From Swiss-Prot:
GO biological process terms held by the UniProt record: translation
InterPro entries: Rbsml_bL25/Gln-tRNA_synth_N, Ribosomal_bL25/Gln-tRNA_synth, Ribosomal_bL25_b-dom, Ribosomal_bL25_C, Ribosomal_bL25_long, Ribosomal_L25_dom, Ribosomal_uL5_bac-type
Taxonomic classification: Bacteria, Pseudomonadati, Thermodesulfobacteriota, Desulfuromonadia, Geobacterales
Function description: This is one of the proteins that binds to the 5S RNA in the ribosome where it forms part of the central protuberance.
Protein name as annotated: Large ribosomal subunit protein bL25
PANTHER family in the record: RIBOSOMAL PROTEIN L25/GLN-TRNA SYNTHETASE, ANTI-CODON-BINDING DOMAIN-CONTAINING PROTEIN, RIBOSOMAL PROTEIN L25_GLN-TRNA SYNTHETASE, ANTI-CODON-BINDING DOMAIN-CONTAINING PROTEIN
SUPFAM superfamilies hit by this protein: Ribosomal protein L25-like
A GO CC annotation given for this chain: cytosolic large ribosomal subunit
GO molecular function: 5S rRNA binding; structural constituent of ribosome
Keyword annotations from UniProtKB, A to Z: Ribonucleoprotein, Ribosomal protein, RNA-binding, rRNA-binding
Oligomeric form and interacting partners: Part of the 50S ribosomal subunit; part of the 5S rRNA/L5/L18/L25 subcomplex. Contacts the 5S rRNA. Binds to the 5S rRNA independently of L5 and L18.
Xref: Pfam families: Ribosomal_L25p, Ribosomal_TL5_C
């Protein structure tokens, strides 16, 4: 996975009033925490954060911090992000400092690939699970896990245990968790004309 770089600054003051003032200046308040460090309050330009988590890697992007005193050069991933429910603006972000040689737990989106045979027969595709919790080395985090639904027939499902996963990826979800199924009746053939 591609590593990205993002500039941050240390934040000396905390609280709702300070956070509101930062957001009014298009700056997102945040915190960096992780193994071996005390949580550190930071701030990042909203446009820089949005650009960093857009595209390849998304929220699971490996981010090298630039600036921020002792945080300079640290590698983080987005652990949590709060958004304004109406506007979608990022209100706060939590960064988790990681080591490239220690496994991390992340959410990885699932992407349905192909047109299911059951859909062609008149059934309806029902996606039940949209992401999986996985554990892997940071450099092995997949952008997404593809689920091939091409051979899925009416009345059948694909479960977590049936997925073909990239090497080094351990799924933390229950293996019997359904991911996608096909419901409905097959198209009836038109009766022959007499």
């Amino acid at each position: 996975m591609e590593q990205k770089t993002m500039s941050i600054e240390l934040r000396e003051k905390n609280g709702k009033g300070v956070a509101r003032k930062l957001r009014a200046q298009d700056v997102v308040p945040g915190v960096v925490y992780g193994k071996g460090i005390e949580p550190v309050s930071v701030k990042v330009a909203a446009k820089d954060l949005a650009a960093t988590i857009a595209g390849e890697g998304g929220l699971n992007s490996l981010i090298t911090l630039s600036g921020g005193g002792s945080l300079n050069g640290n590698i983080v991933i987005v652990a949590d992000m709060q958004r304004n429910p109406l506007k979608g603006d990022i209100l706060h972000v939590d960064f988790h400092r990681i080591s490239l040689d220690e496994k991390v737990k992340v959410h990885v989106p699932l992407v349905m690939v192909g047109t299911a045979a059951g859909v062609k027969e008149g059934g309806m595709l029902d996606v039940v699970t949209y992401s999986l919790d996985v554990e892997c080395l940071p450099t092995a985090i997949p952008e997404a896990i593809n689920v091939d639904v091409t051979n899925l027939a009416i009345g059948h499902s694909i479960h977590v245990s049936e997925l073909v996963l990239p090497a080094g990826i351990k799924v933390l979800n229950d293996p019997e968790t359904p991911i996608v199924s096909i419901h409905g009746k097959a198209k009836e053939e038109a009766p022959a004309a007499e």
